[in-house]
Amino acid sequence: MMQESGTETKSNGSAIQNGSGGSNHLLECGGLREGRSNGETPAVDIGAADLAHAQQQQQQALQVARQLLLQQQQQQQVSGLKSPKRNDKQPALQVPVSVAMMTPQVITPQQMQQILQQQVLSPQQLQVLLQQQQALMLQQQQLQEFYKKQQEQLQLQLLQQQHAGKQPKEQQQVATQQLAFQQQLLQMQQLQQQHLLSLQRQGLLTIQPGQPALPLQPLAQGMIPTELQQLWKEVTSAHTAEETTGNNHSSLDLTTTCVSSSAPSKTSLIMNPHASTNGQLSVHTPKRESLSHEEHPHSHPLYGHGVCKWPGCEAVCEDFQSFLKHLNSEHALDDRSTAQCRVQMQVVQQLELQLAKDKERLQAMMTHLHVKSTEPKAAPQPLNLVSSVTLSKSASEASPQSLPHTPTTPTAPLTPVTQGPSVITTTSMHTVGPIRRRYSDKYNVPISSADIAQNQEFYKNAEVRPPFTYASLIRQAILESPEKQLTLNEIYNWFTRMFAYFRRNAATWKNAVRHNLSLHKCFVRVENVKGAVWTVDEVEFQKRRPQKISGNPSLIKNMQSSHAYCTPLNAALQASMAENSIPLYTTASMGNPTLGNLASAIREELNGAMEHTNSNESDSSPGRSPMQAVHPVHVKEEPLDPEEAEGPLSLVTTANHSPDFDHDRDYEDEPVNEDME
């Protein structure tokens, strides 16, 4: 492409020389005509001999113009045949010099014939027209020289870039972006010059006999070469300033910023084409602040376009330093920030869940259509669940120990211990999020109205599943009512009014509400004049315990033998939480004031489970088989229902399921009859 443009430049240069010869011939014709008409007044009545002489001159001018066009076409064909193959190594970094810009803008034969046939131009006007044509050609030559210099600079920069192979990739990317910017800038200048030339040509062709001669308008109605050089210096200086700061910006978009900053000047020039004085354009180029260092902020996810991107903040920050001050002062580690962080976790999990559902739907569609999958199926990662006793082979086959670990529900990893119970370790803040439901429900930490009040607008507008159990939400709805009692329809209305998730999704959640009302002992149905209303038994609600453990004495002995490990488990929980500084379950979020209280609640629940086990030794079912009785206790991952897949998995200590009703289970989205009340 580089050699093609070079050949094109040579052909255009010869065309310019031919054009100058043609214009000299036109000058001679104009001089002859002016000499002929000097002795007489410029009247309209012309003799027959003069008319024949003018027609002969017109035919000669047309022949010269045709010869010029034929020579141009032949030279372009020869240059196209002789041009070598394109260099594929540098396809995008060449500046295309358009043929319309490099060819001399002479008057076409049709325009010349129209001017001569009209016989409306006086000799003075024809002389002025030819002078303007010469000025245009001179400025075209200057522009051609400038474009040649720019082409040489590009070639030198390309050679330097090829030889400097040891440069880091980021500097090479910035250099290529600068070359692309220069290319776009030159293309923009060429288009601008073409537009102004077309405007001038239209102005030359619409001269009336009574009008004075047109003023001499220079070609450089856009940026003259000196201003273009100044703009290029600004770009290179901005590039050096970016390199000295040492910021790792691999995507420095000079093209968009520079072109957008020069766009207003281009628009103003086209709208005001006559704003030039003495051949120099008096354009006030806007200050290109987008190239300065201040307009390239540090890459921070919470900062963009001078605005803080913290959810619900949108505070205006002048620069990055003021943003950091604002972030440390307004969004420090407090209850409000942790609640907002927890809500953001819910948003992310909801989006991940939606993505997983769409992927499963796509996979099912492709399987149905017998199309091979485009992405490999991820191998399921089994959870490492280690109990205090060695699991038998039959028990390990029956227990759900190889549950797939989906990426949409990040669970807390369990590190195996050789002897003793498994120790739960939290590696990051995000691993604590999935067990938030069991913290609020299993450990007697009730839902706080302050949490819903703080995030009320978010829950009303965003389609995010609230991070609470159905039982907690039903209790909250009843407690918020003036009479502390609600009918079933009023509970439905509270759900849809407070949460957009329940408004916009299918009404399967109503089944879960009816399940929880009917099967939880803490909800009491009262008959009155209105009909059936539901109330909350707070004492029964506070008695909610983890899943009951029952079995034969051998099972109880296993549990008692593992009771000695409760203290190390609590210590490990406290150490891991303190080590990772988990701020997500504070007063505003879960109603628990400190992490110490949370750990103590866990300890109390574990101790309560032990006491409950000792008190229920006689609850073992006599109809159970010995094989069921010898199954040791293991920690299992409790899967949720399909409709509640967005909820996290939780860790519960389970043995053989008790025949008693599980009062703590959150009955959600199970198919029931609609008439069940």
Curated annotation (Swiss-Prot):
InterPro entries: FH_FOXP1_P2, Fork_head_dom, FOXP, FOXP-CC, TF_fork_head_CS_2, WH-like_DNA-bd_sf, WH_DNA-bd_sf. Transcriptional repressor. Can act with CTBP1 to synergistically repress transcription but CTPBP1 is not essential. Plays an important role in the specification and differentiation of lung epithelium. Acts cooperatively with FOXP4 to regulate lung secretory epithelial cell fate and regeneration by restricting the goblet cell lineage program; the function may involve regulation of AGR2. Essential transcriptional regulator of B-cell development. Involved in regulation of cardiac muscle cell proliferation. Involved in the columnar organization of spinal motor neurons. Induction: By androgen in an isoform-specific manner; expression of isoform 4 is greatly induced. Residues 1-18, 270-283, 390-403, 612-623 have a biased composition (Polar residues). It is linked to A chromosomal aberration involving FOXP1 is found in acute lymphoblastic leukemia. Translocation t(9;3)(p13;p14.1) with PAX5. This is Forkhead box protein P1. The record marks Q59, Q60 as: Breakpoint for translocation to form PAX5-FOXP1. The modification Phosphoserine is found at S83, S658. Keywords: Chromosomal rearrangement, Disease variant, DNA-binding, Intellectual disability, Isopeptide bond, Metal-binding, Nucleus, Phosphoprotein, Repressor, Transcription, Transcription regulation, Ubl conjugation, Zinc, Zinc-finger. Residues 465-555 bind DNA. There is a cross-link at K287, K372, K377, K442 (Glycyl lysine isopeptide (Lys-Gly) (interchain with G-Cter in SUMO2)). Residues 667-677 have a biased composition (Acidic residues). One of its GO terms (biological process) is regulation of endothelial tube morphogenesis. Changing R514C: In IDDLA; nuclear and cytoplasmic aggregation; loss of transcriptional repression activity; loss of ability to self-associate; loss of interaction with FOXP2.
